[in-house]
Amino acid sequence: MQDFFPILYAGLPEVAGVLRSVETIDGVDGNAITLYIHRPATATGDVPAILHLHGGGMALLAAVDEQFVRWRDELAARGVVVVGVEFRNAGGALGPHPFPAGLDDCTSALLWLHAHRAELGVSKIVVSGESGGGNLTLATALRARRDGNVDAIDGVYAQCPYISGLYADPPSQLASLRENDGYFLERWSIAVTASIYDPEGRHGSNPLAWPYHAGTDDLTGLPPHAITVNELDPLRDEGLAYHHKLRAAGVSSTCRVIVGTSHAADVIFRAAIPDVYASSARDLVGFAYSL
């Protein structure tokens, strides 16, 4: 997979008008967390910030990977500050760090960003991520609510979230796990990734590990959400279900189905479907400015 993404981005022009910097903060386990900060070069006054939590099933890939650098640049060029988090994941280059290490790092990054709003010129904070990053996005909001830090988040934008953990034997209400199996994403592979994230299987119903299992008491009082799903994604129905749970709990939530696309296609295939990619970038930035 590491070799797959550079091919997709080869030959694309650089994104203009973006300033980049790097910060290192301390994690709860004494670990260092690298933050990649992308700012619009022409910003005047405070602008929204997006805390970006990258995809990879909470087990693979890294914030420094080309596809995620590109996404942060594209968002920043549209007028927001973007902070990418190099969180520990369950099977990546930083070593095997299963749940809850990655969530701990995302929470640390959120609290750092909230504490540095004025310094960074940030008006609002949106937590956002795709796939496994969508899991961490929703879990970060759930944890912030549980810990009394929900005021640090102004909005939540989760793309194709990987949140049920029910991949070995999908329930009937998550029909897309069977109907869309093999469209870019295969169910056996996401079941393996889930087992890497929770190797002893002790957190299968813990909403902080798998937000699909959150109940009304977990969701009530959360900030506005936006959920996007891909029509041909095995994960489609769990994202839709989470949106409905949010609405039932009285949380403001919108949902967007990206028709004719496979898992995360709107944030991966920049060259092949540039109009869809641009639409998703605009929608995320528009959500941040709407808060």
Region locations from a protein language model:
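Alpha/beta-hydrolase superfamily serine-hydrolase fold, recognizing
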Residues: 5-291
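Ser/Thr- and Pro/Gly-biased, low-complexity intrinsically disordered regions
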Residues: 1-3
